[in-house]
Amino acid sequence: EMKQKVTASRLADILDHVNRIYQGGYYSTDIGTSENINIRFNLATHDERGNRLATPGVEYVKWDGTYPIDANDFMNNNKKGYARYLWEPNDYINVMVYPFAPEANSAEVTLGVSHLPFTLKGVNETDGLSALESKYNDISKKNLSFAYCSSINSDFIDYEVDRYTNASHN
């Protein structure tokens, strides 16, 4: 359905904001501005099999389940095979955009959920990241049983992106 799809131009705008943040001096908070960490993100032009994408950065996949989607189930269930929607996580950052099901008995709305990033426990462990035991040092598509990704609620993608890019709200 078209209302569930994010346009190529909107994705390019989102990634432009993200890249400006990572190039430094763009996003200012009470603890300082963003720093240039020499990373630039690009929308994939080809899928992991080498096929050209009609919309850069997007593979539209028909969902066989019910809408809206239970984000907790999608992100954490290792029995339903949702890892099949991933591209190799060592080559791509997997971001899934779909309408989230409301949480039972709650007026709260989840805007986004992420497993990223991880760090390995030990000497080089990075504060603020989810730490994994070193036996999990090979996070690859072939050994994942759950959807190792970030998910954004498509009903709120503009709000979520604007929140991280310091845009104002009315």
Regions found by a protein language model. Give the residues of each.
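Primarily auto-inhibitory N-terminal propeptides
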Residues: E1-H17, I21-Y22
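Metzincin-family zinc-dependent endopeptidase catalytic domain
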Residues: R20-H169
